[in-house]
């Protein structure tokens, strides 16, 4: 995967990681080697990002969320927020995203609710097209195109 984010103004964290100088990354986030984080993105506590993932500009990642290997999350996506369901009262729930997914521009994905299984799951090699929404407690298998 190739990032569309220009490499100007990136801060090299080490030889394998490039994070833009304007990205905000919580100290409690866990980020593997080989992860690129673009301008003005916010990575919250409880977020885990595995190697090879590209986070483009203006992406918001909230936890608890685990993002697998070699995913590409495009600009203005919001991933891992709590459910807007009226029954949801802020209980600890999570989001799990597999490997090799493309999450295009403006996609929103909510964590689960305790009234269901407490987790939203996205499998491997999926394409979530621009402005699609994955609601709380959904489970998406592998090789799905979501419009």
Locations of the language-model features?
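Short, Lys/Arg-enriched N-terminal segments with co-localized hydrophobic residues
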Residues: 9-17
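Structural signal for interior beta-strand "rungs" in well-ordered beta-sheet cores
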Residues: 19-147
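Cationic, low-complexity basic patches in intrinsically disordered or flexible, solvent-exposed regions
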Residues: 3, 7-8
């Amino acid at each position: 995967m190739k990032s569309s984010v220009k490499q100007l103004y990136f801060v090299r964290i080490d030889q394998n990681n490039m994070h833009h100088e304007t990205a905000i990354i919580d100290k409690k986030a866990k980020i593997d080697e080989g992860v690129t984080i673009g301008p003005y993105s916010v990575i919250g506590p409880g977020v885990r990002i595995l190697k090879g993932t590209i986070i483009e500009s203006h992406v918001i990642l909230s936890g608890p969320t685990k993002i697998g290997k070699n995913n590409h999350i495009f600009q203005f996506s919001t991933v891992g927020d709590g459910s807007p369901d009226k029954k949801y009262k802020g209980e600890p729930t999570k989001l799990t995203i597999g490997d090799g997914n493309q999450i295009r521009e403006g996609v929103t994905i909510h964590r689960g609710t305790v009234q269901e299984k407490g987790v939203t799951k996205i499998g491997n090699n999926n394409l979530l097209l621009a402005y699609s929404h994955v609601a709380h407690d959904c489970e998406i298998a592998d090789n799905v195109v979501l419009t």
